Amino acid sequence: MPQLSGGGGGGDPELCATDEMIPFKDEGDPQKEKIFAEISHPEEEGDLADIKSSLVNESEIIPASNGHEVVGQTQSSQEPYHDKAREHPDDGKHPDGGLYNKGPSYSSYSGYIMMPNMNSDPYMSNGSLSPPIPRTSNKVPVVQPSHAVHPLTPLITYSDEHFSPGSHPSHIPSEVNPKQGMSRHPPAPEMPTFYPLSPGGVGQITPPLGWQGQPVYPITGGFRQAYPSSLSGDTSMSRFSHHMIPGPPGPHTTGIPHPAIVTPQVKQEHPHTDSDLMHVKPEHEQRKEQEPKRPHIKKPLNAFMLYMKEMRANVVAECTLKESAAINQILGRRWHALSREEQAKYYELARKERQLHMQLYPGWSARDNYGKKKKRKREKLQESTSGTGPRMTAAYI
């Protein structure tokens, strides 16, 4: 920062005070030169504002004029196909308050969903379908219209091909829908990329583009029946491509057999399982047959049992009771009423009975009779849960 050598206000009048800044111009920079020229000439600001407004007006007029010119050219070549559309000029108004009617209406391009000019619609955001491309210079922002993009590019079609002006198929007549205000083509085999929509199939196809914040109107009411009712389902389904509609059920398309084919296999499995069970039962019986059969050996009678066996008939004859519990109670009372000598007789008979039993069944034990039922239950449970029944029986034997 250059400073005065003498300090104060003396010296050359071109020099300024020490607390002021001197702007130095960078030579060779055209942008900075223009900025300094504007600072030095403020009277030119009004001219720049006029230039900006004229450029903006031209950018708004050019797309509209181009759109009307293209519409005029296409209407001249397609007048014989739109007599029906001219009869209903006011039917195309949408009940949404004119949201879709802002800007020019392209009624000559039939078969498509018409959308407004996105460049002049104030309701569309800057990030919508085809916003204008702003170009900025050094100072003045210039809005350049998209000349490379056709003004009818916001049109939405169901075709993969790009739309070009003048490519309307003139050999296909168009039909005008009085409710929706848009024209459409009947489905024809000459148009492989356009898919006809039947009233039953429209609800199953999702729209390719969803507008946020705008009401959605059903399309099913606008399509008329182009074919008889007996042939509408078959013809409309046959015109869809093979990748949109699944084929008939069968092993050649999905690899999964038909349910009518699966059920016989299940039915064939039931006899197989039954035969397995029938095959298991003989093995269980054979294993039991292989085991040595032990007959049920009754234990020898004691003194009281011998007394009951002898006196039971007398008690039944004396009393009219037929209940065994009541008879046993009577016999028990009489047994305790006997003297020692009378009871000793039955004790001697019981001793002889035990000796005879030991001679007939040597090595017999009363545990064999009492533990046999529990043993059988345990074997059945082990065989049902796991196949360890034979090993357990071998261990117990």
From Swiss-Prot:
Q: Which UniProt keywords apply?
A: Activator, DNA-binding, Isopeptide bond, Nucleus, Phosphoprotein, Transcription, Transcription regulation, Ubl conjugation, Wnt signaling pathway
Query: What CDD domains does this protein map onto?
Result: HMG-box_TCF7-like (cd21996)
Transport among keywords: no
Residues bearing Phosphothreonine are: 153
GO BP terms in the entry:
alpha-beta T cell differentiation; anatomical structure regression; animal organ regeneration; apoptotic process involved in blood vessel morphogenesis; apoptotic process involved in morphogenesis; B cell proliferation; BMP signaling pathway; branching involved in blood vessel morphogenesis
Q: Which InterPro entries match?
A: Catenin-bd_sf, CTNNB1-bd_N, HMG_box_dom, HMG_box_dom_sf, TCF/LEF
GO CC, sorted alphabetically, is: beta-catenin-TCF complex; chromatin; cytoplasm; nucleoplasm; nucleus; protein-DNA complex; RNA polymerase II transcription regulator complex; transcription regulator complex
Region (Disordered) spans which residues? 38-102, 164-190, 266-296, 367-397
Give the residue ranges for region: CTNNB1-binding.
Answer: 1-60
Q: Residues annotated as DNA-binding region?
A: 297-365
**Which superkingdom does the taxonomy of this entry point to?**
Eukaryota
Where does this one sit in the cell?
A: Nucleus
How is it modified post-translationally? Phosphorylated at Thr-153 and/or Ser-164 by NLK. Phosphorylation by NLK at these sites represses LEF1-mediated transcriptional activation of target genes of the canonical Wnt signaling pathway.
Main localization, broad class: nucleus
Is Thylakoid set as a keyword in this record? no
Per UniProt, location of the Glycyl lysine isopeptide (Lys-Gly) (interchain with G-Cter in SUMO) cross-link in this chain:
25, 267
Q: SUPFAM superfamilies this protein is in? A: HMG-box
A GO molecular function annotation here is: C2H2 zinc finger domain binding
- Physiological role: Transcription factor that binds DNA in a sequence-specific manner. Participates in the Wnt signaling pathway. Activates transcription of target genes in the presence of CTNNB1 and EP300. PIASG antagonizes both Wnt-dependent and Wnt-independent activation by LEF1. TLE1, TLE2, TLE3 and TLE4 repress transactivation mediated by LEF1 and CTNNB1. Regulates T-cell receptor alpha enhancer function. Required for IL17A expressing gamma-delta T-cell maturation and development, via binding to regulator loci of BLK to modulate expression.
- Swiss-Prot/TrEMBL domain comment: Proline-rich and acidic regions are implicated in the activation functions of RNA polymerase II transcription factors.
How it assembles, according to the record, is: Binds the armadillo repeat of CTNNB1 and forms a stable complex. Interacts with TLE1, PIASG, ALYREF/THOC4, EP300, MDFI and MDFIC. Interacts with DAZAP2.
Give the family per the record.
Belongs to the TCF/LEF family.
What is the protein name for this chain?
Lymphoid enhancer-binding factor 1
